[in-house]
Amino acid sequence: MRFEDYPAEPFRIKSVETVKMIDKAAREEVIKKAGYNTFLINSEDVYIDLLTDSGTNAMSDKQWGGLMQGDEAYAGSRNFFHLEETVKEIFGFKHIVPTHQGRGAENILSQIAIKPGQYVPGNMYFTTTRYHQERNGGIFKDIIRDEAHDATLNVPFKGDIDLNKLQKLIDEVGAENIAYVCLAVTVNLAGGQPVSMKNMKAVRELTKKHGIKVFYDATRCVENAYFIKEQEEGYQDKTIKEIVHEMFSYADGCTMSGKKDCLVNIGGFLCMNDEDLFLAAKEIVVVYEGMPSYGGLAGRDMEAMAIGLRESLQYEYIRHRILQVRYLGEKLKEAGVPILEPVGGHAVFLDARRFCPHIPQEEFPAQALAAAIYVECGVRTMERGIISAGRDVKTGENHKPKLETVRVTIPRRVYTYKHMDVVAEGIIKLYKHKEDIKPLEFVYEPKQLRFFTARFGIKK
């Protein structure tokens, strides 16, 4: 690792929050009380919080200034029109419906675009996305390239859709039985892996032949654009904004969690070009979120989201963002800690199968590892394996994903390289006595999205 490859933070810190580390004995009590679920730990008991990059970003001085310009009118807020103008300029879609966060957009899209029994092919599932699709009668079909399921394979653009898999599904079920293609840019559960522009264009060409719509999960689209600029031929001289605009020219719409690449703590939106879908979405947003001009958000939050979206396109910001994550991954890899490769956009994913080879998947190695990391060094991470995958809606059996990982997720503009050093040191220390990590079993298992609130105990 060459330290000159990693630039200093491209910002000055104007406001700080004091953090503390409680001692190891206290952390052991905290994790037991939380049922070995890191989601159930109080934030005050966490030293470095790498649970998620969703809503945990630091906002800029301009965004904080925008909060003071909130137009809190119930209808027709000027902040909505600023957000609408910004989204249309950057993404190029005709219509936008704001929502309180990404899953609000997923809920609306699933209701208006899926008929019971239709398939929704996509490049790997995401927890809330698949839940809304299945809740509305859809059948998710994974059509990501096979390489994405191999944690050890270091190849670019592991998020690409396998066009042969998509064509095979069309041939088997008929285009009329496919609601839309759900294309995530980047692919969270594959390790934050990007999708190439070549693949997006090819997916668009194939679906257009069959009259199938394509909706992107745009949550980390700016991170995806950086990888295209860095790794795909013909894009080195393009701006991030130009790349993002081209990406979405191959889509019919998108869902967006603004809590990631819009650099805010709350907010999201749904975009589309189709007028009928837009009218249907506006009818539903009134029921679940609020007026179509605020979608469950305060005006000030829409203003901050509009400003943050523009800030995320700055090359210096997104370069530092990607390289900070890569820095942590390289430190762990150099120490022999097994990680998912290549390092993606928003997190380093620990390969729990290789980290805890003594724990079978049915005894939740990733969940156990996340709990052990907290006890070891006060760092909160997240399970992304069999627990997150949930159960088959028909058989009730556990989904058994090939990737059993712990996501070490870096919030934007929050932590420094020194924080990454501390995280790496803690995980490396734990890896040296990994055989002490104990398998887990359910004490309480919720029926939906169980990873959020499930409780576990040491397996007897």
UniProtKB/Swiss-Prot annotation:
Q: What is its EC number?
A: 4.1.99.2
The Gene Ontology biological process annotation of the record reads: tyrosine metabolic process
Q: Which Gene3D superfamilies match?
A: Aspartate Aminotransferase, domain 1, Type I PLP-dependent aspartate aminotransferase-like (Major domain)
Modification N6-(pyridoxal phosphate)lysine, positions: K260
Cofactor requirement: pyridoxal 5'-phosphate
Give the reactions, separated by semicolons, that this protein catalyses: L-tyrosine + H2O = phenol + pyruvate + NH4(+)
- Keywords attached to this entry: Lyase, Pyridoxal phosphate
Similarity remark:
Belongs to the beta-eliminating lyase family.
Query: What HAMAP family does the record point to?
Result: Tyr_phenol_lyase (MF_00543)
> Subunit comment for this entry?
Homotetramer.
Task: Tell me which PANTHER family the record gives.
Answer: BETA-ELIMINATING LYASE-LIKE PROTEIN-RELATED, TRYPTOPHANASE
NCBIfam families (UniProt xref): PRK13238.1, tyr_phenol_ly
Recorded protein name is Tyrosine phenol-lyase
Q: Which organism is it from?
A: Fusobacterium nucleatum subsp. nucleatum (strain ATCC 25586 / DSM 15643 / BCRC 10681 / CIP 101130 / JCM 8532 / KCTC 2640 / LMG 13131 / VPI 4355)
